[in-house]
């Protein structure tokens, strides 16, 4: 489980910046600004985590038990609430009501994982949803150009197996983009510029955390270069 420090933010859109060598970098802009609204501790809950809130929610749209919990902690109801696990040392740095700053959590050049909800594309066929090639367009093919082919089996087991790639709802799923690089931080506006795309449309809530599967790190097997034999 990812226990690296992280934040929740809102995807603003994409832009371009130049690096030190003049190369154009296509970046996704994420607006941070989440507030610590609660904590989990080892002594009470058995694990350590920060409960973060983003955006405001009208109290009339909040149930009374939840509104009472917010009032007890001195906070206003939040539209988005996420619980991010972290080390006890990291959780101890922040008090309830503190707004997380991007320059306190991340640094330029750091690798991060971004998680969000992908753009929904509705009911789609197998060519769009699964990149099937489709049937041939000649030699007697009739009204079968974009079909997925056979979905059945033999007499045993005699049924369509679960998990088969078929037409259905495409998108609107939780997607994680791994090992993205932070190109720039704007602490005065609490913005993060991340190289490459981040899942979801504009105004989508995303979770940004330190990368788990760092490139060249543990779990990554380096490519072995062939060595020439002596005298060969």
Curated annotation (Swiss-Prot):
Alphabetically ordered keywords of this record: Ribonucleoprotein, Ribosomal protein, RNA-binding, rRNA-binding
Paired cysteines (S-S): none
Oligomeric form and interacting partners: Part of the 50S ribosomal subunit. Forms a cluster with proteins L14 and L19.
The UniProt record lists the keyword RNA-binding: yes
Family: Belongs to the universal ribosomal protein uL3 family.
InterPro entries, sorted: Ribosomal_uL3 (IPR000597), Ribosomal_uL3_bac/org-type (IPR019927), Ribosomal_uL3_CS (IPR019926), Transl_B-barrel_sf (IPR009000)
Protein task: One of the primary rRNA binding proteins, it binds directly near the 3'-end of the 23S rRNA, where it nucleates assembly of the 50S subunit.
NCBIfam families: L3_bact
Keyword rRNA-binding in annotation: yes
Superkingdom, taxonomy of origin: Bacteria
Record's protein name: Large ribosomal subunit protein uL3
GO cellular component: cytosolic large ribosomal subunit
Molecular function terms from GO: rRNA binding; structural constituent of ribosome
Biological process terms in GO annotation: translation
Organism: Sorangium cellulosum (strain So ce56) (Polyangium cellulosum (strain So ce56))
Alphabetical list of SUPFAM superfamilies matching this protein: Translation proteins
């Amino acid at each position: 489980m990812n226990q690296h420090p992280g934040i929740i933010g809102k995807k603003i859109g994409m832009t371009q910046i130049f690096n030190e060598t003049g190369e154009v970098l296509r970046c996704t802009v994420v607006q941070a600004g989440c507030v610590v609204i609660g904590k989990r501790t080892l002594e009470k809950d058995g694990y350590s985590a920060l409960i973060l809130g983003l955006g405001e929610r009208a109290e009339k749209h909040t149930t009374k038990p939840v509104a009472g919990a917010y009032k007890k902690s001195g906070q206003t109801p939040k539209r988005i609430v996420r619980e991010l696990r972290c080390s006890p040392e990291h959780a101890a740095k922040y008090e309830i009501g503190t707004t997380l700053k991007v320059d306190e959590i991340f640094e330029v050049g750091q690798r991060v994982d971004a998680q969000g909800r992908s753009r929904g594309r509705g009911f789609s066929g197998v060519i769009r949803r699964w990149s099937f090639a489709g049937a041939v367009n000649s030699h007697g093919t009739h009204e079968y150009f974009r079909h997925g082919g056979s979905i059945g089996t033999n007499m045993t087991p005699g049924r369509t197996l679960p998990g088969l790639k078929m037409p259905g709802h495409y998108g609107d799923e939780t997607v994680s983009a791994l090992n993205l690089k932070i190109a720039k931080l704007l602490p005065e506006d609490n913005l993060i510029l991340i190289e490459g795309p981040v899942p979801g449309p504009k105004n989508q809530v995303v979770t940004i955390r330190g990368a788990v599967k760092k490139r060249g790190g543990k779990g990554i097997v380096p490519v072995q270069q062939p060595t020439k034999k002596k005298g060969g």
